[in-house]
Amino acid sequence: MSMRIPKAASVNDEQHQRIIKYGRALVLDIVEQYGGGHPGSAMGAMAIGIALWKYTLKYAPNDPNYFNRDRFVLSNGHVCLFQYIFQHLYGLKSMTMAQLKSYHSNDFHSLCPGHPEIEHDAVEVTTGPLGQGISNSVGLAIATKNLAATYNKPGFDIITNKVYCMVGDACLQEGPALESISLAGHMGLDNLIVLYDNNQVCCDGSVDIANTEDISAKFKACNWNVIEVENASEDVATIVKALEYAQAEKHRPTLINCRTVIGSGAAFENHCAAHGNALGEDGVRELKIKYGMNPAQKFYIPQDVYDFFKEKPAEGDKLVAEWKSLVAKYVKAYPEEGQEFLARMRGELPKNWKSFLPQQEFTGDAPTRAAARELVRALGQNCKSVIAGCADLSVSVNLQWPGVKYFMDPSLSTQCGLSGDYSGRYIEYGIREHAMCAIANGLAAYNKGTFLPITSTFFMFYLYAAPAIRMAGLQELKAIHIGTHDSINEGENGPTHQPVESPALFRAMPNIYYMRPVDSAEVFGLFQKAVELPFSSILSLSRNEVLQYPGKSSAEKAQRGGYILEDAENAEVQIIGVGAEMEFAYKAAKILGRKFRTRVLSIPCTRLFDEQSIGYRRSVLRKDGRQVPTVVVDGHVAFGWERYATASYCMNTYGKSLPPEVIYEYFGYNPATIAKKVEAYVRACQRDPLLLHDFLDLKEKPNHDKVNKL
């Protein structure tokens, strides 16, 4: 059964009502001025805001990045006016009334974008795509649990913060939210409190046009503590009481199901029109008259409303001072752990982190995933910032280091005997790829550099997580994603598991570094680069063994994104090899070398290559000062290679269920076949140089391919 909180008494009910009413009027004024925005839920949630920022949250308006602050995440990010207005009321210096009025304006420097953005004060993560924020919140809660279990000592609870997340009806319809809710309950994250703005209205009408399940029962089934509050658009005291119960809960996260009214008090209350529309001048005037306000006054907050929050900056200063004093004493009492903690607060890895990594590259044939495995294991074993995990494919990806401890609810007893606690740094995410990467974003956002999240699964399944990876790029958050079993060499599992189109998507995402190394030397260089970059990276790795290129491939050169693997003076043709398919490119180049001066290039990361000087890029692609026929050989689609090559020998259909050694033959990845096609192309370009500008597809589709049956 859910806990239903009876109405609580409060001596401040009258003042609460004034704040709620003036807050609603301010929302309407702000939205009205530019004729757009999302007023409804911001109006309906005003009582929740008072309960949070007046009575519950630990925060410091003068130091919004205070390390041990409670984190608040607005998962239903379109309700951002709710958050901005309370930032203004509680005294966040940057959130002036002028800034509030810049919402939906053409002001380039507005701090009030249409959805909250991480670069602004007191915003923990960028939200907007529904379901992301609650997943990020699970990551933030994991971060807190792990830091507390790692560093807290008797008498020195230096990490005590909680995570509060507000969600709406639509958030709870999204897949990643449900994945994260399930995992949070399984982990027993009792430091996570979710407030559900339950107004039962969506864009197209009432929520029951699409959803009729019992949300509280769903959370209960996922091992959440559930508290229900009626009249949550008005009753501040009862929400505060619910939050107190939630804070006291041990062993489970808490959902506070707050029954609210969208557009409260206005003509469009309880109607979908309140979601994303201005009310209109007559409607705003009507609400102000109803509330006993001067309808001519716009953007007005009376002094007594400001006074209600006036102690919050001083309270925050005291909180910060006391915490800093506690940390100073901790550092004296535990100098080794203390210095390590301070370094992590600064976002620093151990200064000697590179020395943890293996120094010897593989000499024999080996999958590129094997090299990445050794690197992750070495870094994870020696660096507490690393928190790795996998989407139920640890047996294939195999990143666990010797002595690894799992991040798990310590009370959990599994049938297979696996156990752990909150100091563990390896997470079994289950088949929840989207949540995994969104949770990694939360870990990365806790405090930049305090955690280095590393996720892993088959490369194909990062497609499930693409929205979360995009959000990492948007927020400039750093995680390393280990995608194994890439290209068609994934093999017998067939085209459902062969990610022929995925690299094009991830290469297109700003601030995401897609890396596909050809051998262990490149893996070593690119993994090191991924650790150094301030952005997220995806290492796309082979299932099968690949050739090594000693004396030719280079860890250092790979960090520049592209280089000449094997040179030929005054080359007549160039072959770009990528990942596991470099073997075919390299061997085809040897055959071509009998007739043409042939150069072999490796371009494992186009984004890194694009960041090099134009002089360097020309020295690789046009070493002889002229464009020569350049053919890329890749086991994925050619889309995007037009910038670097003049023709492709790439996948132009989906894959097929065949063993790796057979599937390449089936799709024509044969050195002799490739050499024959490239030779014909070179001779055609000699006859018609304009072909160099047409980016031709040199690979034929298999005769038995489904496409050719149409």
Curated annotation (Swiss-Prot):
Binds 1 Mg(2+) ion per subunit. Can also utilize other divalent metal cations, such as Ca(2+), Mn(2+) and Co(2+). It is found in: Peroxisome. Its cofactor is Mg(2+); Ca(2+); Mn(2+); Co(2+). The record marks H38, H275 as: Important for catalytic activity. GO terms for biological process: methanol metabolic process; pentose-phosphate shunt. The keyword Protein biosynthesis does not apply. The active site is at E433. InterPro entries: THDP-binding, Transketo_C/PFOR_II, Transketolase-like_C_2, Transketolase-like_Pyr-bd, Transketolase_BS, Transketolase_CS, Transketolase_fam, Transketolase_N. A motif (Microbody targeting signal) lies at residues 708-710. The keyword rRNA-binding does not apply. Keywords: Magnesium, Metal-binding, Methanol utilization, Peroxisome, Thiamine pyrophosphate, Transferase. It comes from the Eukaryota. GO terms for molecular function: formaldehyde transketolase activity; metal ion binding; transketolase activity. This is the major methanol assimilatory enzyme from the methylotrophic Hansenula polymorpha. Belongs to the transketolase family. This is Dihydroxyacetone synthase. It comes from Pichia angusta (Yeast).
